[in-house]
Amino acid sequence: GLSSQQQTDFANAFIHPIRNSDNTLHFLVIQKDGTVTICDSAGTVKSLTNNGSSYLSGLTNPSTELTATTVADFTFLVNKTKTVAQSTNASPTRNPEALVHVAKSDYSVTYTLSITKGGQTYTREISTMASVQDSTADSADAEKSIQTDRIASNLRYNTTTETAYYGTTSGASIPGINFALYGNVIHIYGSSSNDDFTLEATDSRGGEHLRVFKGETPDFKKLPTQSPENFVIKVSGDNTKGQDDFYVKFNTNVTNGRPVWKETIKSGIRTTIDPSTMPHTLTYDGSAYTLGTQAYDDRLVGDDITNSFPSFIGEKINDVFFHRNRLGFLADENVIFSEAGEYFNFFSKTVVTLVDSAPIDVAVSNNQVSILRHAVPFNESLLLFSDFSQFRLSAEQLLTPETVSIDVTTRFEASLVAKPKGAGKYVYFPTKKGAFSGLREYFVDISTETNDASEITAHIPSYIAGTVKSMAASSNEDMVCLITDDDATVVYPYKFFYKGNDKLQSAWSQWKFSGSVRFMEFDQSDLFFVTQYGDKVALERMNFSRDDALSDTSFPVLLDRRVKLTGNDTLPYTDATAIYVTTAGAIVTASAAATFQAGGGTVYAGVPYTLIYRFSQQVFRNQKQPITTGRLQLKNMAVVYANTGFFNVVTVPHKNLPVASRTTYTRAFTGRVVGGGTNILGTVPLDTGTYRFGLQANAQNAQIELQSASHLPCSFQSAEVEAEFVLRSQRM
C-alpha cells in the first residue's frame, strides 16, 4: 500500500556506522580537515584518542576517498589516496661465511681445504695415519688421528697445529678470514662485509668425508647438527616435489635443548609493511575509541620470489572487507587476503609447503583493464565490481590459495562512486546514462544457474538526476535508497515486494528534505540520516516500524525533525514552520505548548511535510496492449484507505494548459465520518473505508494527486476508476 512515511527524530550528526560487539550503534565522522568525531545513536559524542592525523591529511572529499569496515570492536579505515609502501626495516645481514663439516673419517685419508680471496688461493691439507702400525701406541695414535673434531680443528687456518695431533698438516694463514670450531664443523667468516671468499673442500675418498656449505645447499638433510647461532643458508627446492627454495638458520635457543635448523628469511631484504601507509584501526574498549596505526606482521621466511610482498605495495587500496575469516583488500586488479584467522599477516609463514591458511593474492583475468573498486559478500562468494565488469570470487568448502578462483559473471557498466549494497539475495549497483543515473539488481537465476543484473530503472530513465554518491539497503524493509550529487535534498527510495522468486510490486519515489542529506544507513527498521541545515549538522532517524509517539498518544505523530518535549524542553532548532502537537492531537502555539509542558504534559514538535502521490495516466487496454483509437473519459474514482486521519484529493482536469489557466479542485478527507464509530469528540479519528470523488475529465489531460501535509497518518491500499471509452471509428 501507499503510506505517508515516518518522520525523522532530531539528534546530532555523522557518517560511517559502527556496530560494536556490545550491539551499540555509533557513527564515525571524518571531516575534510581530518577532524574525527564519534557519536552514538542519541548524538552523544564518544571519547576518542586520535593518533591517525597524518593518515587523514590531504583529504579533499572524504566521502569518496575513505572507506571502512567494522568487525566486533575493530574498524579498519582506508584512505584510498595513500600509496602503500614498504618500510626500510630489513632482515639481519652477516659477513661472508661458510661451514666445513667433517662428516666422516678414515685411515690414510687426505683432507684438503682451498680458500680463494682477492685472487689468491690458500690451501691447507692434513692426512690421517694408516690403520696398520708397528706398535700398540702407534695404533692408538692412528685412532686419534681419525677423530672428526680433531680433523676439523687442524683444517683451520691461522692457527697452529693442534698439540698431539697424530696426522700430518700443512697450509698458510689468510688475511681477513677468521675461523671458529664447533665440534667437527669449521665456521669460516670474513672480518667485514668486503672480505668475501670462495672455497673448495676435497678428500681422497671422492668427497664423501668433507662437506662445504656456503650460500646454498641442495640437501637440507646433510646440514650439520652443529653451527654458530643464526648461520643462514639457502636450501634449493626439490622441483620433482614442486618445492620452492627456502632459507634456514641455526637456532640453539630451543626448549628441548637440542639445536635445530629453523626456516627463516633471506639476509638483508625488506621485511616490513610501512604501517603509516596501511589502513588504520579504530578500536573500542567499551567506553572510548582509539584511532591509529596497526602493526602488521613482518615477513619471516623466504625471499622476494618465494614470499613476495603483497601486491598492494606501491598501489592504493580501494576497498577493505572481511570474507571467510580473512581480512581482504582490493588494489588495482588484485584481491589480497590475510592469513586465515590472522588479520594482520599478509606473508606466508612457510615456503616449504603451501598451507591452506596462507595469505591469498590473486588477480582478475579479463581481456580489458579491470580496476577493482568494491567487494560485496554475496551467495557464499564475493562479488567484485570494476567499472565495466562484475566478477565472482569463489572457492570450495575452504578458501585457500589452491581453491580460490575468480570468474567474470556479467559485463555491465557501473557507476561506483557509491558502494553497491546487498539486500536479501540481491545486490544493487548504480549505473550512469548521461546526466541521469539508474540502478541494476544483480541476482543468480536458480533455474539456469546464470548471473544477471536487471535494470530496475529502465522505465524511468530521466527520474534520478546526477551521479549516485550514497546508497542504503534493507532486507527488513525491502528497500533501497539513493542520494545523488545533483540535489542533496532529495532521496530516491525504491520499495519492492517479493513472494518467492517473483517480484509482485515495486515503486520508485522521492523524499524531499529541507536540509542536505550527506549520508544514510539502515539499522534494522531504522534509517539514519546525516543532514546538514545551513552550518548545522543533525543525525536523524526514520523509523519504519512502530512510532515511538504511540507510547503517549493513540495516533502516530508524523512530523519531520520531530522531538518530544516535556518540562522545560524547547525546540532544539529554529524553523518558522514548526508546529506543536499535544498528546490529545491538538495543534497549539509555542507558548501554549510551554504552558502545557509546565503542567506535566507532553508535546511533540516538528516540521510538517507534504506527501504527494500522483496517479499515472489512465489507459484503456485489452489483454495485450493499450487501445489508443478512442477517448477515455474519467467519471469517478474510489480510493481505499486504512487508519487515516487526513488527506486531500487534488485534481486538475486540464494539466496541459498553462499554469495560470488551469483549474484545480481540492477535496479534503478529515477522518470524521458522520455516524462513524471513530467520530468521537476529544479524540483523533482514524478511519478505514473508501473515499469516492468525481472527475469528469479526459484521461489524457487529467492530473490526479493524493496529498497530505497533516501530522496525522494516511495509508492507501488501492484505487479504482470508473470511465467511459468511446471509439473514434468502427471497422466496417
Kindly label every feature range from the protein language model:
Residues F74, R94-A103, I126-S311:
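Long, charge-dense tracts
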Residues L2-Q5, A295-N325, A331-E477, D486-A488, ...:
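Beta-propeller and closely related beta-pinwheel folds
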Residues S41-K46, S54-S57, N61-S108, Y182-R205:
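Hydrophobic or amphipathic alpha-helical targeting/insertion segments
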Residues N12-I15, S21-D22, L59-T64, A68, ...:
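Short alpha-helical segments and helix-capping/turn motifs at coil-helix boundaries
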Residues L2-Q7, A11-R19, N23, S437-M732:
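Beta-sheet repeat architectures centered on beta-propellers
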Residues Q86-E97, L398-A414, Y609-P626:
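A short, polar beta-strand/turn micro-motif
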Residues G1-T44, D219-D319, H323-I371, G434-N451, ...:
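N-terminal beta-propeller domains
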Residues L28-I30, L77, G328-F329, L382-F385, ...:
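Conserved beta-strand element within WD40/beta-propeller blades
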